[in-house]
Amino acid sequence: TIAVLEPLMLTHVWGKIKFPEKKGDLHLRGGLLPCHELIKAINSLKEGEMLISGEDWLAHRNGEKRIAYTGDFLLVKRPENIFSWNKEQLEFDFDLLTSGRKSEPIHHSNQVFGERIFLEKGVDIKASVLNSEEGSIYLAEGSKIMPGSVINGGLSLGNSSTLKLGTKIYGATTVGPHSKVGGEINNSVVWGFSNKAHDGFLGNAVLGQWCNIGAGSNNSNLKNNYDEIKLFSYLSRSFDHTGLQFCGLVMADHSKCAIDTSFNSGTVVGVSCNIFGSGFPRNFLPDFSWGGPQGLKEYSLEKAHLTAKKVMSRRNMEYNQIESDILSAIFSSTREFRGGTGLA
């Protein structure tokens, strides 16, 4: 789940609601990305020990006895880290998931380049191009790639997800389970149960769960003057430097945009927003925003609950009390951001 909020704030808002602590559990730092050396160190932790590196705790087994870790690791602290580091993580995951396994056969109607392609059972792909020479391609169980698609790896396509007719993937892209994606996608991460099913460009971007991108919508990922792109931070309450020339859209869970929506480079959309209207909306759209370039108002929490319930029920998922409590907690904790923009 991505709520755009940086890890510390995210944990404070809902982490303990959905994942209460249990004795004997191994606790991993949110946003910690694995490598073989780190995995070995974590597996060696004993009850009561905590693995640390400098000021960062990485993992613990219900204790605070500090064990120093001096090896390499990556820790996601900003949303742009997610797509920036995705290429390397795709290759790590591909090696881990395919070790000792045999891919299902690739239908003869496809054009195939490179060897790093793996299909799980039930994958449906015909009359498409699979090029793994620049990155691996992993297609999970029950996923589907419609004819005419061109895949330039890396790509990880989640179980029961679909790439629509003529989809173009430019690499370093992850699509979670039960999602539909189409158009042009470059270096983006789409969480599960989200749709960008139509033409339009999504690049250097992150979409949370239960998002929907209307047909013909696009995001810019490069400023016309080629300057560094800044991105709004909930922690600093300002637009922070990313050090990136390419940075597109970051959209949190349960948010949606209408057809032909255009997002400027470095746009952050909070939780449960509904964006529509001609022109570019502002670069930070607070959680529970309703509107677009012509103006924004606060989206009713009650209506947000009803919409989330409808959306999840379409995928046979229950919008239970825990999910409701999380959305309510985010609504309360982000009120200050709407207040500063005239929404509340």
Task: Please state what every model-predicted region is.
Residues 165-166, 172, 178-343:
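Glycine-rich hexapeptide-repeat left-handed beta-helix
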Residues 24, 64-68, 101, 105, ...:
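Generic, low-specificity signal for short hydrophobic/alpha-helical stretches with a mild N-terminal bias
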Residues 1-116, 122, 278-283, 287-344:
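Terminal amphipathic alpha-helical/low-complexity segments used for targeting or macromolecular assembly
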Residues 22-23, 48, 158, 252, ...:
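A general structural motif
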Residues 101-208, 223-224, 250, 268:
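Extended beta-solenoid/beta-helix repeat architectures
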Residues 14-16, 149, 199, 243-244:
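A generic local structural motif
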